[in-house]
Amino acid sequence: MIATEQKKQIISNFARKAGDTGSTEVQIALIDARIKELNEHFKTHKKDFHSKTGLLRLVGKRKKLLDYLKRTELERYKKLIETLGLRK
């Protein structure tokens, strides 16, 4: 799990206004942090297939949110992709 301090930092970095915890950018950033954490977990636990299922679910959720953001607000999408270092 992501530490509370790390969550607060991610929320403050991607929030659109004070107290914003549910915007699309914040949700994508939190899911991305969890995905990166799971990838580190898999480096030592190669046969943890149950967690791999959860990882695939998170990747799908992030993709859906990214598609939504791209469809609704392209500039915010491009900025987020660049900040998170997702697509090349």
Swiss-Prot record:
Gene Ontology CC: one annotated term: cytosolic small ribosomal subunit
Keyword Endoplasmic reticulum annotated: no
GO terms (BP aspect): translation
Pfam families xref list: Ribosomal_S15
Keyword Ribonucleoprotein: yes
UniProtKB keywords: Ribonucleoprotein, Ribosomal protein, RNA-binding, rRNA-binding
Gene Ontology molecular function: any one: rRNA binding
Family: Belongs to the universal ribosomal protein uS15 family.
Description of how the protein assembles with itself and partners: Part of the 30S ribosomal subunit. Forms a bridge to the 50S subunit in the 70S ribosome, contacting the 23S rRNA.
Protein name per its UniProtKB record: Small ribosomal subunit protein uS15
Species, as recorded: Leptospira interrogans serogroup Icterohaemorrhagiae serovar Lai (strain 56601)
Gene: rpsO
